[in-house]
Structure formats: C-alpha cells, structure tokens
C-alpha cells in the first residue's frame, strides 16, 4: 500500500486525460446500482481483441478497508491497460464459493489482496484450473495488512495458513465469526508452497525501489523494459521448489522495514537472500505469477467507501510509478500464453534458482502470533463477515432501493433456517400504475428440492415446502413495485440454494443464496 502521493499536479492531469481516453477507446460497460455480489459485474471490452480473457476476483474482501481492488476502481489503470492490450476484462462477483466453472472460460485469474480465506473447495478449484492450463496472478502485501480486521491478511490467505494459528484457522475469533459462512470449509495447509513451489514470507519491508531485475532472457521476457519496480510496504516470497518457481525481481540490499512491522520486518538484509519480490511458477499446463505488494498495481481512483466506517478511501497512482505498468502487463501476457512444458527444468537455457533459505520459525507449525490480532478493534457494529453491517457506499451495502434492474430480492446475507424471516421482492419496468398477477416465490436446493414455506396472505402457513400461493404486484407511477413476504426454511437444511420468482410456471428471476443457522435480521 502506498503511503504518499506519487504524482505532481501536471502528471496527475496527464494521467486523468489518459484514463478518459482509455475509457472512450475501450467501452466499459456502465453499471447502475452495481454495489454488491448480486448485481451485474463490470467488464471492459477491447476495441481490438486478442481473443483472451482476464477475470479479477472480488469475492474475498478485495474492497475491505482502504483497498479498492476492482477494475472500475482502484485497479482501473491496470484493467484499462489490459483492455488496451486486447484483453476482455471482467470482475468476478458472487456471494457463494468459487468453483471451476467460474474460472474455466478465462485465461488469467487476478487476485488482488484477498482478505477472506479461501475454502478448501476453492483452493481445489483454483488448482484444477491451473493444472488444466489456466493462470493465476497473486497480488499480496506486507504481513498484517489485515484490512477487514478478521486476523487474516493476503499473504496468509494465499499461503493457506495464518501465522500462529496452524492448528485452528479461526483461533481468537468470536463464536459468530467462527460460525460464519466465510469460515466454513477453511483449513490450514501449506497450499501455495506445496502446489506452486513458492510462498509469501511474513516480512514487512518499507518504501524501496526494487532494482535487482533478472534479465528478460532468464525471466520469460516479463522484465523486458523493466529497470525498477516500486514497493511501498510489502513482502517478498520464498522459492521452495526451484523446479516450479523462479524469482524475476529482487530488492536491493536494505534494512528499511515498514514502520508498523510486528517483528524485524526485514529478514535477510534484502537482496536475493530476502527472496524475490516478483516470482513466477509453472504448474502442469498452467502458470502463476506473484508480487509482494499491491502498491505497483493500484491507482488513485477508488470507487467505494470504507465498509467499516463509510469513510472515503485514499489510494495512490502506483501503476504509473517506476516501470510498474510494463512489468504488470508483461506478466499477464506471459500468464495468458499457453505453453506445453510442465517444469522449469524443461526450459532450454534457463538457470534455475536455489531454494530461498528460511528460518525454522517460518515453518507453518512453528509460526507464532507476535502481537494480538486484529491489529485494531473493529468499529462498533461492523462485522467483516456480514455485509448487512457495512456502511452506505461500500461494496456489499444494499439498503438502497433498486430502481434499475427488472427483478431483485432484498434479504439478509445468509438466510436463517431456525426462524421466520422476510424477503422483499422488487420489480421495475412495469406499466405505470398497473397490476400484474400470478407471481410465486420458492427456495430450492441443488437437487431441486423445495426447502421453504412462504406465509399465505391470510397469515396461515402451507403444510408442505414449495412455491408460495400466487400473489399480485401493483406498480407505482414509475413502474416500480415491491412486496414483502415471510419465509420459513426447513431447519435441517443449510448451505447453498436458489431463490426463484416465477410468474405462473415461468421463471422470472433466480438468485443464489446461502442458508445457515444465523439470527434473523430486519430488512433494511
């Protein structure tokens, strides 16, 4: 994360002009009311397509705290540069776990500072995606860059284990946190190292210009045109399997640590011994790239407010600093290129790295929590796992009435299975002041089995789970209609399901939902 402005007024005006030109050249799909996982995801369509597609993750806390790592916000310079290079770029937004089907249509999956741990099922999906020829770009940060105060930072999320919490990934969490849907299916493992031959170290270095650049001929041409790369509080990586992974950018010798580092910050005096700042990996048919700081990727155009406080975010124009832009676009170009070799030993003329020497206390089971976590107490009423507690203007905040989309549901983040709760049904685009009939609503699981009862208009309840009795909706002068229904879910059901609105027997709108044993929350 950058700590200071990087551009003067003149350069900033030039950057703004460049951004405006980029938007007009590319054709960003505008989104109304695109504020949560159930809204249409933004995308960038290139004027001249190269036939390849890049997907940016926005399902694991990428907008928590000051982060705004989305393609129409704090990562827009990067995303637009990829669009200018011919890539179709899209954001992944959803409220359920990532699956292989989410990734398989894309050449590269970019993960900017995930702050919510990936479930083992998601790790399996990502690994299967890479082994099948896809590529992932992991963008990390310094240790303890815990933006949503859930005790997990991006380095820990990517590695697969929390520092000092190897035996219990929910250590120190409240009962509600540990029981949240976000923490279900999470298990400690040395996942990144075991599968990609590299791991993020839990160091925390300060403001440093990386100028130890591996020559393009030994870096798959990713470093072509790259002499320097910025770091503004970041980490390095450790190569654990040189047959899979290789460093391509290193820091100079340094003792400069991040001012708030919980330990010595700099582990081996910088240089090659500190481990690479930027690295790559070849896994089966696919690839991966890694960088230890989000500062080189971000720009100064955040989209959202802070989910915890509602405050304005400040991000910086790091993509324009040093040779950051060239490195990042080159990285995606390499990641998007399919190559048949499955090990770095098969690359003619390539000099393999030596494994990075790490301390015994860096081994997963030996790590310790050096300071109490989270690093600060969350604001009163803010729960990182519950978007209904997020502040207005943040990603996931959903109390505004949707007056744009044809259909929408408003409900709490997880649907309770032990009590009656309410759902608001919204329709737009109807004929002004008209009444339409024949609507019904139901909730069904992955097997198509109905799992909910909907209260009848006379206050009684049906005897079996299924679609509701028919009801009508009357539009106002603007063609907007709403109806609130009370629902009771089978108490033995939990996990993923679908909520569907029909008109007679025709499906009109379907939304993926999650069912859990959670308290009832009032509608916003």
Predicted regions and their residues:
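Sec-dependent N-terminal signal peptides of Gram-positive bacterial secreted proteins and lipoproteins
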Residues: 2, 10-34
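Aromatic-Pro/Gly-enriched surface loop or interdomain linker
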Residues: 33-105, 142, 315-319, 337-406, ...
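Structural recognition of the beta-strand scaffold that forms the well-ordered cores
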Residues: 54-56, 90-91, 107-112, 135-140, ...
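Solvent-exposed loop/turn segments at secondary-structure junctions
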Residues: 60-63, 95-98, 110-118, 136, ...
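Second-shell loop/turn segments in exported
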Residues: 61-69, 110-116, 173-182, 314-321
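A glycine-rich, often tryptophan-bearing local segment used as a flexible ligand/cofactor-contacting loop or short
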Residues: 117-221
